[in-house]
């Protein structure tokens, strides 16, 4: 019996002395296998008297059970520790910041349009839109642009046929508004316009905002005051502004508006004037009773000046290196 006790103690010590699952399986075979040390003890049964056999057999079985139990507990413990180590290695630290999703930003042209709409909206101007495919009446005739005016030439205008074209300005929106609504009117009309031109400062498609005010007793001083305030608000500077006499078929008198640049040179930013009586007559408004003023500005031109962009084409190339500057 002392030999059996010694074998059990050796087995338990071997089990406790290893952290390797493969080694534990080898210990199981060495002690509990068919040729294992504890199994071999059963061979001694033949040398015992009948009276001793039951007690000895019971002792061997108890030894087997003790070693098997200790072995199972050790295997389970090691597997649990191995699992915990694996989970710890694969765990996610929820305190770490997540992956940032890049947010989009408004295009500089969109920003400029919104600034213009906000300013004139505070003055009571509503925003009107119209078709980009226009007929010659709304694009030319109603605006007092004669049949032989250079603006009607093929090299300036994209024609579908002699009477239908891509609009060259958003003035057609003003004509449609005056046809359908009665004065007093205060509107701005932002939108895309098209001209057959492409270089560093021109593109075939660009954005324009035109404004119109028609009411009784409207004068040029009001136009100057509004545009003065607009330019100073838009550029957020107390700019020098000048009005130069000019010519547009749809306004009389007409002027072009310049601002003083940082380089000390005048920069043209928009055109304006008092609505020509012929334009009012073309939409059934009495020019003896009503007068008005109109103005128009290129959105890309204003964006270039505000953001210091040198090439107009940058706005249309979808270069993220350029666009990310305006987030």
Swiss-Prot record:
Gene3D superfamilies: Bira Bifunctional Protein, Domain 2 (3.30.930.10). One of its GO terms (molecular function) is magnesium ion binding. Its cofactor is Mg(2+). One of its GO terms (cellular component) is cytoplasm. Mg(2+) binds at residue 252. Belongs to the class-II aminoacyl-tRNA synthetase family. Phe-tRNA synthetase alpha subunit type 1 subfamily. NCBIfam families: pheS. This is Phenylalanine--tRNA ligase alpha subunit.
